[in-house]
């Protein structure tokens, strides 16, 4: 990936573009440029992968995954960034409704990376959930 591609990807993940520092860009670029990083990117973001995901979502078994959510018996915490452009907030509503013992915590002024953008609040919410 190019530096510009990394910057565009990072900015899509966050609410506050100030989080996308030169240091973060260089770190992610270095990681993505390793043989392992290139292989992961290829598996996750290639045209073939996107076509396979799209075909699966349109196929006759597309609903099957969600059909299993009511079987989850463990207490479940969903964390979501209110301003997530990757998986918008309404994407949390179906699992919230289908998982019997599920709760949702929404972080304001937060994109896809709640654990980075709202680190202290995220850790507090998750720790509180795990200690119950």
Q: Regions from the language model: what does each represent?
A:
Residues 3-68:
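Conserved alpha/beta-hydrolase catalytic His-Asp/Glu region
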Residues 24, 65, 74, 88-97:
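Short alpha-helix in the alpha/beta-hydrolase fold that links the catalytic acid
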Residues 72, 78-80:
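Short beta-strand/loop motif that positions the catalytic acidic residue
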Residues 79, 97, 128:
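C-terminal subdomain of alpha/beta-hydrolase-fold enzymes, centered on the catalytic histidine
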Residues 83-87:
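Acidic catalytic loop of the alpha/beta-hydrolase fold
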Residues 100-132:
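Catalytic active-site module of serine/aspartate enzymes centered on a nucleophile-bearing elbow/loop
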């Amino acid at each position: 990936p190019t530096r510009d591609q990394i910057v565009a990807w990072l900015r899509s993940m966050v609410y506050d573009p100030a989080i996308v520092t030169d240091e973060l860009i260089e770190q992610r670029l270095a990681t993505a440029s390793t043989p392992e990083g290139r292989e992961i990117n290829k598996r996750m973001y290639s045209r073939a992968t996107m076509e396979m995901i799209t075909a699966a979502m349109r196929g006759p078994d597309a609903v099957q995954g969600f059909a299993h959510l009511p079987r989850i018996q463990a207490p479940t915490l969903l964390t979501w960034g209110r301003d997530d452009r990757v998986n918008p907030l309404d994407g949390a509503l179906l699992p919230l409704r289908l998982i019997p013992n599920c709760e949702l915590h929404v972080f304001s002024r937060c994109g896809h990376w709640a654990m980075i953008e709202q680190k202290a609040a995220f850790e507090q919410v998750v720790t509180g959930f795990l200690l119950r």
